[in-house]
Amino acid sequence: PLEIEELEDGDKAVTLDKYQTKPTRITDDELYSLSYDKKATVIERHKEAISEKKYSRAIHAIAPNENSTATPVILTSGEASEGRKIMTRKDIVRLKKLFDKNKVPKAGRCLVLCSDHVADLLENDQKFYNQYYNAESGKINKVLGFEIYEYDDCPYYNATTLKKVAYGSVPADTDMQASIAFSPTRMMKANGSVKTYASEAKNNPTTQENLISFRTYSICLPLKNEAMGAIVSAKVTASAGDNK
């Protein structure tokens, strides 16, 4: 008979991050006179604000802290342009090889490109340009096995030490933005319920205004310090020459 194998498992306590919006004032006069539903618009904007903050913190959390064998952080290697080296397909190939070497699951690999790197590939890689968008699915096509996404608020790294800049910090002159790669199967996320805080105008006789805000809890983290990678824009000094 085959030997029976036990799978060790258990619960782990995780503290979720809190996200909340400041109350927005909507007067009864506005609701009466405006031609659109301002309350619905305000609610939508609050939801968008919370989502933007959650996504920003999540991409930072699942980006490697620094370069290591298990979490490779590499520099772009293309031509110099506007103080940095552009991203090329070769950079993605290099990261793919490192993921393969680390036995990162091939299924579902994601690469989130910062805006500079998207522009680099669109302007300089005809193949990427041609297969960038799938009109039928409405999605960006895969590149070298990676599901491709775009995000403007990708984290920054020190271009020399390849260490990640702390979340919320203002990037220094030594810091450059990165594109982030990861395996979703090695990440975790948890979302709490959304709570609405609202006071109606009928309960505010002196101001006759409605107030509304929201609060929720969420977190996104790597399960282990592995299956993550980053491609950081290499910094080019003025003496190296800027050819574009």
Regions found by a protein language model. Name each.
Residues 68-139:
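Extended, solvent-exposed, turn-rich assembly/linker loops in the middle of proteins
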Residues 28-30, 38, 56, 60, ...:
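General "foldedness" signal
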